[in-house]
């Protein structure tokens, strides 16, 4: 019962905040929760969902390359600018932090609750997007490492 109340609360916040992605995500989880024999699928979604999402995002990012909108000329132009190098650096940093964050979530699943709560606040009230949990977990890992507070170490 507690999980239903929690999900309904998140759904209500998502509706008030008019966040379609969160509304769809919570609604889908609630529908799967209603259907008998979906525990294994929900577990699979929990363990592989982020990877699936990253795959979809990666495919979406590749579309301009596939359609010819972005080619080597654009790549060469962007690496000639400071903004391009900053973007490359940020991409590398986020990739490394995300890898560390996924490791932290594996070591300390209870951290997920705080990250999800923070992500919901950011998504609903600050008009962010829900790509935050992996990046947030990576930042959390770095901060916890600095203060020697990483769970399990």
Curated annotation (Swiss-Prot):
CC per GO annotation: plasma membrane
Subcellular localization, as worded in the UniProt entry: Cell membrane
Coiled coil listed as a keyword: no
Residues that span the membrane, as ranges: 4-24, 52-72, 85-105, 115-135
Pfam family, one: DUF441
Keywords from the UniProt entry: Cell membrane, Membrane, Transmembrane, Transmembrane helix
Sequence similarity: Belongs to the UPF0756 family.
PANTHER family given in the database record: UPF0756 MEMBRANE PROTEIN YEAL (PTHR38452:SF1)
Name recorded for this polypeptide: UPF0756 membrane protein LCABL_15860
């Amino acid at each position: 019962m507690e999980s239903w109340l929690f999900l309904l609360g998140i759904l209500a916040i998502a509706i008030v905040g008019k966040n379609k992605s969160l509304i769809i995500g919570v609604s889908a989880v609630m529908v799967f929760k209603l259907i008998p024999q979906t525990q294994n699928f929900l577990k699979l979604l929990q363990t592989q969902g982020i990877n699936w999402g990253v795959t979809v995002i990666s495919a979406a990012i590749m579309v301009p390359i596939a359609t010819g909108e972005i080619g080597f000329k654009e790549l060469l132009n962007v690496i000639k600018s400071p903004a391009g190098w900053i973007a490359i650096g940020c991409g590398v940093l986020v990739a490394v932090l995300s890898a560390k964050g996924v490791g932290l979530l594996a070591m300390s699943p209870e951290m997920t609750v705080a990250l999800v709560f923070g992500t919901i606040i950011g998504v609903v009230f600050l008009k962010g997007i829900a790509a935050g949990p992996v990046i947030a977990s990576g930042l959390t890992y770095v901060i916890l490492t600095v203060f020697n507070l990483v769970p399990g170490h």
